[in-house]
Amino acid sequence: MVEEREPLVPPAVADGARADALANLAFLRRPSSMPHAEWLSDWLDRHTQVAIDTQGTFGYVQNPVVEHLTDGGGDVTGIVEELFSMTAMTDQHAFYGSGGDQEELERRFTTLMDSCARFGAAEGLDLVPTSRYLFSL
């Protein structure tokens, strides 16, 4: 079971329609050496803005895991959905929002990776490129 936060609210789409976006899902694992409260605060309170500022995202949804409902997934402590333009699949400048500036791309990449390393997201991270659909249930 997860909680949901939307620091950067994704654009609305019609029921059942695909969003015009690359939706990257990132499955985060907390390092065993880092207390849960510290990890959660570092991810939600510090890293969030770094991720938004260093990537070309137009939707950013965080899902802290509050309870594991099945066996086998207990090491995942957070799930992030980041929305990018479709061009971000093949263009690093679109992915990082660097506008074609190589130095800016490198600065953004380094800043993001340093931030990820601080709370353990530089290791054991699973990324799944996918699409975003919303359905009324």
Model-derived features with residue positions:
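Macromolecular interaction modules
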Residues: 1-137
